[in-house]
Amino acid sequence: MDVQIFPHRLLGADTTEKLLNRLEDISGVKRMVIHGQRLPPEDHPDRRIISVKGHEFELQVKTGRVLLEIEDEDTIADIKRVCEDLLPFGYDVTPGKYIRTQKTVTDEIKYGEDLDKVPEELIGLTDQNARLSERATIIKRKKEH
């Protein structure tokens, strides 16, 4: 099951970083994808390194929506609590199917013979128009003992 968080305004780097960290704390969240306008390649205050649970990566978009793959509907209440705390300007949380889980013909055209080398957790997370260096960053959830 997937959920879309649609903030009523674009998120800056600080808010994106806080939101992703709080969402990562929710045990029912399996994967997260951020979507938005690409930031200009030159100096921009939001094009910076952000940290999500100790994993650092360069934020390359002005966050307009966050897609989450979740385990069950009970997780939605936890997601809404996080949004209520961090997005006072308003937001919509909508369940649906947003993240692809199977390889497509487009993937085959994009990756060619290397398609079998694409990790399963990357399926549905990459921008087919992006260069390899700009593709998704996977943040692995630490196993709880």
UniProtKB/Swiss-Prot annotation:
Entry annotated with the keyword Cell inner membrane:
no
Any one GO BP annotation for this protein: methanogenesis
List the coiled-coil residues.
none
Q: Which InterPro entries match?
A: Me_CoM_Rdtase_D
Keyword Protein transport assigned to the entry: answer is: no
| Pfam families xref list | MCR_D
Keywords recorded for this protein, A-Z: Methanogenesis
Q: Which domain of life, per UniProt?
A: Archaea
Subunit info here reads: MCR is composed of three subunits: alpha, beta, and gamma. The function of proteins C and D is not known.
Protein name per the record: Methyl-coenzyme M reductase I operon protein D
Q: Which species does this protein come from?
A: Methanothermobacter thermautotrophicus (strain ATCC 29096 / DSM 1053 / JCM 10044 / NBRC 100330 / Delta H)
Which gene holds the coding sequence for this protein?
A: mcrD
